[in-house]
Swiss-Prot record:
Pathway: Cofactor biosynthesis; thiamine diphosphate biosynthesis; 4-methyl-5-(2-phosphoethyl)-thiazole from 5-(2-hydroxyethyl)-4-methylthiazole: step 1/1. This is Hydroxyethylthiazole kinase. GO terms for molecular function: ATP binding; hydroxyethylthiazole kinase activity; magnesium ion binding. Catalyzes the phosphorylation of the hydroxyl group of 4-methyl-5-beta-hydroxyethylthiazole (THZ). It catalyses: 5-(2-hydroxyethyl)-4-methylthiazole + ATP = 4-methyl-5-(2-phosphooxyethyl)-thiazole + ADP + H(+). It is an enzyme of class 2 (transferase).
C-alpha cells in the first residue's frame, strides 16, 4: 500500500459515488452526511428495522455506529448487518465507547459476534474492550492504557476475523498479517465531535469501491489525515469551528498532489 494506491482509491470513490448506508448516532448524523458528500460518496441514513435489510442490500457499504445506542437501533443494526453479509456488502463497525458501560460493551461484542465485519474502527480502548482486553476508557473517548497498539490490533483482527483500524496520534490498520502505520492527521480533529465517526463512514465509502478492505481502510486513513492537515493550515488560528468547515472543504478538494506530498504510510511488522 502506498500513496499512489490511495490516490487511485480516492478516484474510484469520486467516479462511482457509492451509496453508504449509515446506522449511526444522532450527534454526528449531519456531519457524517456532509462529509461523505464532500468526499464524493452518497450517504443514506435509514434506521427503521422494517427497511434496513432492503437498504443494506443495495448499498455499496453498511456502517454501524453505536454512539447513541438503544435497543431498537441495535436490533436494526443486526438485521442490516446480516442482510449485508448475505448480499456481499462490506460492513464497517464503530464500537463507540465500548468499555464505558457494561451495556455498551456487551452491545459491541454482540454485534461483532452476530455480524461478519469487514472493518472495525475505533480507538485503542474501544477495540480492546470489544475483544475483552483490559484498557481504560473515559466516557466515549480513549482513556489511558498500556500495551502495544500494533499487537492489540493484530490480536483483534485474528479474533474477530476482520480488518482492524485503531486510530490515535498514529493510526494502525491490519488484517492480522499485513499491517500499515499512518502518520497523518491533526490535533484539531479531537476538538470537533464526530470526526472519528465520519472517518468510519469514509472507510465504508472506500470499502464500497476497493474490495481489498485492508487497502481500502489504509487509503481512507491517509486521505482523511491529509485533509485534516490541509484544513488546519487553511483555518489558521480560528479554532475548531472554522476547522470543521475547512475540513469539509478539504475532503472535497484533496487530490493527487496533496496525497503524494503529504501522505505518510508505511508497512509495519
Amino acid at each position: 500500500m502506498n500513496n499512489q494506491e490511495a490516490i487511485n482509491a480516492l478516484q474510484m470513490v469520486r467516479q462511482a459515488n457509492p451509496l453508504v448506508h449509515n446506522i449511526t448516532n444522532v450527534v454526528v448524523t449531519n456531519f457524517t452526511a456532509n462529509g461523505l458528500l464532500a468526499l464524493g460518496a452518497s450517504p443514506v441514513m435509514a434506521y427503521a428495522k422494517e427497511e434496513v435489510a432492503d437498504m443494506a442490500k443495495i448499498a455499496g457499504a453498511l456502517v454501524l455506529n453505536i454512539g447513541t445506542l438503544n435497543p431498537t437501533e441495535v436490533e436494526a443494526m443486526i438485521i442490516a448487518g446480516k442482510a449485508a453479509n448475505e448480499a456481499g456488502v462490506p460492513v464497517i463497525f464503530d464500537p463507540v465507547g465500548a468499555g464505558a458501560t457494561p451495556y455498551r460493551t456487551e452491545t459491541a461484542r454482540n454485534i461483532a459476534s452476530a455480524v461478519q465485519l469487514s472493518v472495525i474502527r475505533g480507538n485503542a480502548a474501544e477495540i480492546a474492550n470489544t475483544i475483552g482486553e483490559s484498557w481504560t476508557i473515559k466516557g466515549v473517548d480513549a482513556g489511558e492504557g498500556s500495551g502495544d497498539v500494533v499487537s492489540l490490533a493484530k490480536k483483534a483482527a485474528k479474533q474477530l476475523k476482520t480488518v482492524v483500524a485503531i486510530t490515535g496520534k498514529e493510526d494502525v490498520v491490519t488484517d492480522g498479517n499485513t499491517t500499515y502505520i499512518i502518520r497523518n492527521g491533526h490535533p484539531l480533529l479531537t476538538k470537533v465531535t464526530g470526526t472519528g465517526c465520519l472517518l468510519t463512514s469514509v472507510i465504508g465509502a472506500f470499502a464500497a469501491v476497493e474490495r481489498d478492505v485492508l487497502k481500502a481502510a489504509a487509503a481512507a486513513l491517509v486521505i482523511y489525515g491529509v485533509a485534516a492537515e490541509i484544513a488546519a493550515k487553511n483555518a489558521g488560528d480560528e479554532g475548531p469551528g472554522s476547522f470543521q468547515i475547512a475540513f469539509l472543504d478539504a475532503l472535497s478538494r484533496v487530490g493527487a498532489d496533496e496525497i503524494s506530498r503529504y501522505g505518510r504510510i508505511e508497512q509495519g511488522e
